Amino acid sequence: MDEEENSEINSVQARNEDVQLEDQSQSQGLQDRQVDAIEQAWNDAMPDEPSPPAEYAFHDPLAIVGEGGDAPEAMVEDVLQDDTASEGSHPSSDMSLESPGSEDDSDVQGLPNWMIPQNRLRSAVDMMVSQARNRDGGIAALLSGDNFLQRVRSMVFSQERRRSRTSEETSQEEAAEEPDDPPPQQPPLPPIDIGFDTNLPAEHSYFGNHLSRVPGVDYLEVGSVHHMLIFLHHHILFPGEVLPFMIDGQMFDDDMPGLDGLIFGVSFPRLQPPEDNPHKLYGVTCQIYERGESGRGLVFYKSRALQRIVINCDDIKGSPQYIARNPTNKCFSNVKILPEYFLPEPLQSVDMGSMARFRDIPSMRDKYRRFQLSTTTWPSDACQEYSFGSIVERARQRLESQKIDTMPKCPIQLSFWLVRNLHLTEKMMRLTFLTDSVNTRLQLIKSTFKDETLFFCRYCNSSLALCSDLFAMSKHGVQTQYCNPEGYIHETNTVYRVISHAIGYSGEPSTKFSWFPGYQWHIILCKFCAQHVGWEFKAVLPNLTPNVFFGLSGSSVRIGKASEYSPFNGTTYVVRNMLRMISSDME
């Protein structure tokens, strides 16, 4: 009897185990079908036509005007912001301090064949989510499986291999067809005359016409130490730059340093100090030269950077705040004025006696120089290498296309002016700021004359525009600081055009608080990561040229060499956006 009961119990347990195995098999099959559906949707999103050759392509303002067309980009949709950006916090994105985080990749034809359009990617994710909700455990159970993550990684890497293979095949075909020809260059930009008063942006007239002039400029003695109010700034300012800002008027007292305009210090946390002085902050002194009431409890100020300073962090009293974020607490510190050493050209120390009268005669200048060289032991190449005049002439030739006619003659001011208008890399900007020698600063600048540089998105590293397309819409140069209605300060770089398919648009165009009178502004976003990178400016008044240009925000772009250029850099973008969409649907 006991044997019969045990046999019946064993048979029941066996049937239960079979049912459990069958349920597990069905569950695993459902998971495999869901992953297969994702992979099929992923593969369906891949077009079969070959990728076009990787060349520079641009939004040409002349072509837009000639064709009479409007901006071709569609309005972008909201997506999550990039929490892996290099900046700690995403800055204000437009002139009204709204923060768009949007993108529209529905234009499939504008993408390379290896990159998955976001609308198809979203459809695939939505299908996976809807199927996963019909089973026990939901999406969390699906994502917990190693099989799913392995399949996702496999799909992503397969697209990367396909992209690399396509690029190699394209390069080989181009090399076979044109073995002796150089690589394709960017299309030349037709010369455009500036039909705009470049004095208007420099006056910051968007603040209004009620500003009062504050006379006087005070230069402090080199090496002296002064106690003054200090702020932080997210951009590096060089002496000579104008810093407009909006702040509570109670932050400044009448008894602060300055014979006429108030003097305060601005330091740059992004400027890494030398290794031997890790507890130092570097910055500049700024002096207010115009101010006026805004009517909202804040005061508009226009200030100019004067001298470089260094601050010992141990001397700071209080918590320093960013000047662009409406600071409410005062912070004081002792600051030391840094020197500017300039050595004249070597040949100027050679006394030629009565022959010196020929030095200033243009027709005799070259002969006089050769005669000077014959009396010294220095080779002519060495003298030419350190000649201030040769550096100025080469810089003038490089900046000729930017239509800048305000190049200073003072070597000290010129060295800072060239840094702002030649757009050096962040590493080079740091070196030029920290050096006390004007000659060394000019030599560092000269070493960059042969480099071709581009603007890259600071968030996803995609290329946006060529630095050779910079031009001056302000008499101060191609790079100028502007302030929006909320007090946020934007470092803006003006370019004729941007690389095609590199940008999208957000919001509606507006003429309110325009930094360039007669132009409307429209927010532009990076096409890959949907982060704010600047504005498009389009003329709304007749007889203004250029009709269209772009302003790139310094906090959203970085300068890099042309060797870093890649037509598309979307692998990280694809993975990040897919995982963020899955995460958002799980919440």
From Swiss-Prot:
It comes from the Eukaryota. Residues 182-191 have a biased composition (Pro residues). Residues 1-56, 78-113, 157-195 are annotated as: Disordered. Substrate recognition component of a DCX (DDB1-CUL4-X-box) E3 protein ligase complex that mediates the ubiquitination and subsequent proteasomal degradation of target proteins. Has an essential role in mediating growth by negatively regulating insulin signaling. It also has a role in maintaining presynaptic function in the neuromuscular junction synapses of third-instar larvae. Residues 452-561 form the CULT domain. PROSITE patterns: CULT, LON_N. This is Protein cereblon. Likely a component of a DCX (DDB1-CUL4-X-box) protein ligase complex. May interact with pic/DDB1. Gene3D superfamilies: 1.20.58.1480, Peptide methionine sulfoxide reductase. One of its GO terms (cellular component) is nucleus. One of its GO terms (biological process) is positive regulation of Wnt signaling pathway. Transmembrane segments: none annotated. Disulfide bonds: none annotated. It comes from Drosophila simulans. InterPro entries: CULT, Lon_prtase_N, Yippee/Mis18/Cereblon. Zn(2+) binds at residues 457, 460, 526, 529. Residues 159-168 have a biased composition (Basic and acidic residues). Residues 170-181 have a biased composition (Acidic residues). Residues 22-31, 86-96 have a biased composition (Polar residues). GO terms for molecular function: metal ion binding. The lineage of its organism: Eukaryota, Metazoa, Ecdysozoa, Arthropoda, Hexapoda. Pathway: Protein modification; protein ubiquitination. Its main location: nucleus. Keywords: Metal-binding, Nucleus, Ubl conjugation, Ubl conjugation pathway, Zinc. Residues 227-453 form the Lon N-terminal domain. The keyword Metal-binding applies. It is found in: Nucleus.
